[in-house]
Regions:
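S-adenosylmethionine
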Residues: 101-168, 196-201
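Conserved class I S-adenosyl-L-methionine
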Residues: 42-51
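S-adenosyl-L-methionine
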Residues: 84-112
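Substrate-binding/catalytic lobe of Class I Rossmann-like enzymes that use SAM or dcSAM, i.e.
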Residues: 147-233
């Protein structure tokens, strides 16, 4: 009830029903990757762009209280008032390993080892910065629901695709899909099994794709190299220089560090 999703009687607040559905759907994806998380030590999860932290609190309750994991979750957001309120609620509930910090994703250096990185509607290139951090930390799992993929909309330079680029809504949707496709291929390049899945029905949010990446230690070099070549060729064809490429693809080796 403190988060404004449920009433005192345990009913979902009507105006928050879409958010309630999104959080529950995200927890289903978390449940799917539980075999990738260790149970013999503390598990660290980063929630970048946590906002009011509906998902962050739900994950902590689900993993610690219901599944019995020794869990540490860190929520990061730029909004000082939001972080202050979330920190207050964590203390109120006795969640001593649920911590919140104010700051940007690209500048956050508060941990050295992370098991899972999640983002739910981290806007535009914030998803790329979160992905880069996850790779640098060696996260076993990445779950990301991107939004507001505007970057490539300003970059596309392939004149032969005018049947798409001449129409704003088609151009916008194509560039959003291209952004997430490049991200997925970069994760494959770094040794992850990667899927792009439908997050939730469009009626609840138009931002309905989830990138799920699970690291595999025995990923073949050939597969990684193929993914890297596909990224290069695709970006060259359309004149793209996305943050995911400049920040990750060009600065990390093909083998995950």
């Amino acid at each position: 009830t403190d988060l404004g999703v449920m009433t005192q009687e345990g009913k979902v607040v009507h105006a928050r029903f879409d958010k309630f559905r999104q959080i529950n759907r995200f927890l289903e994806f978390v449940e799917d990757i539980l075999p990738e998380l260790p149970k013999d030590r503390e598990v660290t999860i980063l929630d970048f762009g946590c906002g009011k932290s509906y998902l962050t609190f739900a994950m902590y309750y689900y993993l610690h209280e219901l599944k019995g994991y020794d869990i540490r979750i860190i929520g990061l957001d730029l909004k000082k008032d939001v972080i202050k309120n979330c920190s207050r609620l964590a203390v109120k509930y006795g969640y001593d390993k649920l911590n919140f910090y104010e700051g940007s994703i690209e500048e956050f250096e508060g941990v050295t080892q992370v098991d899972m990185v999640v983002t739910l509607h981290a806007c535009d290139t914030a998803t790329d910065y979160a992905m880069y951090k996850a790779l640098r930390w060696g996260a076993s799992v990445i779950l990301s629901v991107p939004c507001c993929q505007h970057e490539l909309n300003k970059q596309i330079a392939a004149s032969e695709f005018e049947p798409i680029t001449d129409y704003g809504i088609l151009k916008e949707r194509f560039c959003a899909l291209a952004t997430d496709g490049i991200r997925a291929k970069i994760l494959e390049e770094q040794g992850y099994d990667t899927q792009i899945l439908e997050f939730i029905d469009m009626e609840h949010t138009p931002k309905n794709l989830l990138i799920r990446a699970i690291h595999r230690k025995k990923q073949s070099d050939k597969k990684k190299e193929k993914a890297a070549q596909q990224v290069d060729a695709f970006c060259k064809q359309f004149g793209f220089t996305p943050t995911s490429v400049s920040y990750t693809h060009l600065t990390l080796p093909t083998k995950r560090i």
